[in-house]
């Protein structure tokens, strides 16, 4: 990359593997990306020194950034925006006292991205229970980002480059009980999701005419109505309306036969109706190398495809694989470049 993008990385749950994988990935990609870690500077410096004494961190306060903007970024160091912990961290052991700290790091990242100081944000995994135990109702990164950016509808998409061709799988519904999925798939909701997918694949991925393949909800895509009418009553009318706008959107396909090379060739994204319909295929092919992307936001956000791995954190440094974090940063940088190009 001729000009390094500025990527803010929230280090997530401090007792998990987030701080370690964030430091490792930021250091490995320092030649191509200006990574800004957001977290407790002393805590991160301690981890960095244990990983590699040659890793140099430079700390600054968020107030200094707000007053004077971001300083220059030497390639031989990582910048940290200091956000002090509330309590001492024991690897692998959750502490609700640090729940609000995790949200503070997110708030800094969101604020900086909205102010255009950061080209994108990448989030390390957090522990929802710790934040809720701190007295803050919290359902997840995606919902929090949507609320903080006043975004009405967002789309969760996972992507990987570990397959024969890049595979992107978006979801019409996310963390819902299976019994609630059918009722959540309405004409307006599905149409809005396809609008977001089409727009962001163009603007944030640089795909001029994206092709989107859509699964049915029911086995065999409803078998002509014998196994459910959602395909007839909702999904097909939505696809016809999208096609009338000029979108290259196809389906509904039976989900059990969609993920084959002859159908995926030339496709830019698959839209699945629910979480465990679309993600097992992607995670089987690329677990540890996948990237979670939130579409529909006014900012770019990617994340890893795994959790806090408290057991690995408790076992000590060097146990965790930072491959997904590397990919999340790379994808964020690529999306930032595509977004700038589309805006020119």
Swiss-Prot record:
The keyword Oxidoreductase applies. It comes from Herminiimonas arsenicoxydans. The keyword Ion transport does not apply. Its main location: cytoplasm. This is 4-hydroxythreonine-4-phosphate dehydrogenase. Belongs to the PdxA family. It comes from the Bacteria. The gene is pdxA. GO terms for molecular function: 4-hydroxythreonine-4-phosphate dehydrogenase activity; cobalt ion binding; magnesium ion binding; NAD binding; zinc ion binding. It is found in: Cytoplasm.
């Amino acid at each position: 990359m001729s000009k390094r993008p500025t990527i803010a990385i929230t280090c997530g749950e401090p007792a998990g593997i987030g701080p370690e994988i964030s430091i490792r990935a930021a250091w490995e990609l320092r030649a191509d990306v200006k990574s800004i870690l957001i977290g407790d500077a002393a805590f991160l410096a301690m981890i960095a020194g244990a990983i590699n004494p040659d890793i140099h961190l430079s700390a600054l306060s968020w107030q200094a950034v707000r007053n004077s903007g971001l300083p220059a970024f030497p390639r031989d160091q990582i910048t940290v925006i200091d956000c002090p912990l509330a309590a001492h961290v024991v690897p692998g052991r959750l502490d609700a006292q640090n729940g609000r700290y995790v949200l503070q790091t997110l708030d800094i990242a969101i604020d900086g991205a909205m102010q255009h100081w950061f080209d994108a944000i990448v989030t390390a995994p957090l522990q929802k229970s710790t934040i809720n135990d701190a007295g803050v109702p919290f359902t997840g990164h995606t919902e929090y980002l949507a609320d903080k950016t006043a975004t009405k509808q967002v789309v969760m998409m996972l992507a990987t480059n570990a397959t024969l061709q890049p595979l992107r799988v978006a979801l019409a519904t996310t963390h819902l009980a299976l019994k609630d999925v059918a009722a959540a798939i309405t004409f307006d909701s599905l149409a809005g999701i396809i609008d977001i997918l089409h727009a962001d694949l163009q603007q944030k991925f640089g795909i001029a005419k994206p092709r989107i393949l859509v699964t049915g909800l029911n086995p065999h895509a409803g078998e002509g109505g014998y196994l459910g009418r959602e395909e007839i009553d909702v999904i097909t009318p939505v696809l016809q309306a999208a096609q009338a706008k000029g979108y290259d959107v196809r389906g509904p396909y039976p989900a059990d036969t969609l993920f084959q090379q002859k159908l995926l060739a030339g496709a830019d994204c698959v839209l699945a109706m629910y979480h465990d319909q679309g993600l097992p295929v992607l995670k089987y092919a690329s677990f540890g190398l996948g990237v979670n992307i939130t579409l529909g936001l006014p900012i770019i956000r990617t994340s890893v495809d795994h959790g806090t791995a408290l057991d690995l954190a408790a076992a000590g440094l060097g146990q965790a694989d930072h491959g997904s974090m590397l990919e999340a940063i790379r994808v964020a940088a690529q999306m930032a470049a595509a977004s700038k190009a589309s805006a020119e």
